[in-house]
């Protein structure tokens, strides 16, 4: 969305969240890291962001809601940002310990970010009618986008994986702002890839050519499965499928989601598990004796490297779960192999 507004000559500032949070300014290609205090990410940092927007005399801000807790989402929207265009990308099973326990609860929590007397962009899905009612209560115009109208030929123009959902949402934002579709489509093509963008890389091991996909940024099973399905549709040459699942001790709910909604639903030959609090994965894999399961919790990283190289033979290596901990090092290691 930032690149679309920039393409249309807006003085736009963008701010991303997550591990590699950045500031983007319309007048430079350089991206500036968000310097955080010792306590880490905090919605209070939004005050500094707004000050920078004002100082630069920008006329647009594209900003992710960094709050997960519903109460913090209310504060983020009503007190810190006051966005006049809200965007709800999807309702998925992530952070269920805070937003759940059901998807209906997640949808309800997201209503905190719907503006009053503004515009709301949502996807055409099972929650469209629910958000429509909430938008009407707040006198906000609803813009519903449909991923099925995005042509595959456009998606193939990017040098990284792009999903029709994302393109549809950005076109909805363009409509809300008043940017024509042609400008919006070109703006997306001109956009620098997000740090979490899914790229496909070849690497050699055991005298064979292997395919590597870093899907750590997806964070939850539904998006991860969508990425895997997309990769499989491209018919890359491989005879073996290796899943690397990296777990976090402070995200055991996320690990459980992958156990419940991913490991038993997708096809693979080998599961390599790294990180911490992997017990539930081990318990599940005891019910899958036909698959090779290797657990590296508590082991030296050099053992993980050797294990990956040993298994990579005409293989697709697909990384999922969390980038924190060994995840980032695993991605760097494989990306460094010719």
Enumerate the predicted regions with their spans:
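Short, structured coil segments at secondary-structure junctions
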Residues: 8, 82, 116, 138, ...
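Short, conserved loop/helix-junction motifs that constitute active-site signature segments
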Residues: 77-83, 112-117, 234-237, 261-268
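ATP-dependent carboxylate-amine ligase catalytic core
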Residues: 2-107
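Short, polar loop motifs at secondary-structure junctions
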Residues: 17-20, 125-128, 147, 275-279, ...
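ATP-dependent carboxylate-amine ligase
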Residues: 1, 176-179, 186-193, 197, ...
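Adenine nucleotide phosphate-binding catalytic loops in nucleotide-utilizing enzymes
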Residues: 96, 100-107, 111, 118-222
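Short, surface-exposed amphipathic charged segments that create phosphate/polyanion-binding patches used
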Residues: 30, 153-165, 286, 305-315
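Short internal beta-strands
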Residues: 14-16, 87-88, 119-125, 242-245, ...
């Amino acid at each position: 969305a930032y690149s679309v507004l920039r393409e249309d000559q807006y003085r736009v500032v963008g701010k991303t969240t997550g591990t590699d949070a950045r500031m983007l300014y319309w007048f430079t290609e350089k991206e500036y890291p968000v310097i955080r205090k010792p306590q880490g990410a905090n919605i209070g940092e939004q005050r500094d962001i707004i000050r920078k927007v004002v100082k630069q005399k920008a006329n647009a801000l594209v900003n992710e809601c960094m709050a997960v807790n519903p109460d913090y989402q209310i504060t983020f929207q009503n007190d810190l940002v006051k966005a006049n265009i809200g965007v709800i990308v999807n309702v998925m099973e992530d952070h269920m310990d805070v937003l759940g326990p059901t998807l209906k609860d997640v949808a309800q929590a997201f209503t905190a970010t719907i503006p009053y007397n503004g515009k709301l962009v949502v996807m055409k899905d099972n929650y469209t009618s629910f958000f429509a009612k909430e938008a009407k209560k707040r006198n906000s115009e609803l813009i519903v986008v449909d991923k099925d109208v995005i042509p595959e030929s456009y998606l193939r123009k990017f040098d990284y994986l792009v999903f029709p959902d994302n393109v549809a949402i950005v076109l909805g934002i363009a409509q809300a702002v008043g940017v024509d579709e042609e400008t919006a489509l070109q703006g997306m093509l001109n956009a620098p890839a997000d740090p979490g963008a899914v790229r496909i890389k070849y690497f050699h091991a055991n005298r064979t050519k292997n395919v590597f996909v870093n899907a750590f940024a997806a964070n939850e099973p539904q998006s991860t499965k969508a990425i895997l399905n997309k990769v499989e549709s491209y018919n890359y040459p491989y005879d073996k499928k290796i899943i690397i699942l990296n777990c976090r001790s402070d995200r055991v709910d996320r690990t459980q989601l992958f156990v419940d909604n991913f490991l038993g639903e997708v096809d693979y030959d080998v599961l390599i598990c790294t990180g911490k609090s992997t017990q539930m994965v081990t318990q599940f894999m005891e019910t899958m004796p036909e698959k090779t399961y290797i657990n590296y919790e508590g082991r030296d990283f050099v053992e993980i490297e050797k294990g990956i190289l040993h298994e990579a033979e005409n293989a697709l290596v697909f990384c999922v779960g969390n980038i924190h901990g060994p995840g980032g090092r695993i991605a760097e290691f494989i990306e460094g192999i010719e």
